[in-house]
């Protein structure tokens, strides 16, 4: 199982296949097209199997959609409008503070998050994609949108009690203090407790 950070997938996958292992490879497969091609070539050369974790195909909600589309009752599907709704706290956790905050360590959101959605669309349509376009920019989570008098770290900030992105609220009050110490708390620190989380979050 390769479930490391995005930028590590390629190296770990190649080494595992060369060592004789079949792979369950967490998405995204790799961070560049060249790395993806190399993983495919290595799999073919070594006779290893690579399974990518596109798990949403097996969720009851999406299997029902696929069944309905395949039934033909809706005719030919010409357009799919599919939205990836990332909750504000999830955005703050994963893509501002978390493991996917730096482009050097991860992939763009269309790959890191939306590859599930792209996989579903291809699966729903039963055909290969001919073209993909993606556009966007970093706009909201920037220094110019920070409230006046805010600080670099949550726990030093005058708005910590009212901010929707408050680390104290997201990790401590809404989760740890209610006994929910799994994701996302356990991505901040192994075996989290309220005290350990606060200490880790205070250090940034």
Q: Could you say what each language-model-derived stretch is?
A:
Residues 1-4, 53-54, 112-113:
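Small/polar loops that bind or transfer phosphate-bearing groups
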Residues 7, 26, 52, 104-108:
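Short, contiguous strand/loop micro-motifs
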Residues 38-55, 75-82:
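Rossmann-fold dehydrogenase core element
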Residues 5, 28, 54-57, 84:
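Structured beta->alpha junctions
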Residues 56-203:
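Predominantly a Rossmann-like dinucleotide-binding segment in NAD(P)-dependent oxidoreductases
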Residues 22-26, 48, 103-104, 115:
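A near-ubiquitous, low-amplitude feature marking generic local secondary-structure context
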Residues 1-42:
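Beta-loop-alpha module in the N-terminal Rossmann-like domain of NAD(P)-dependent dehydrogenases
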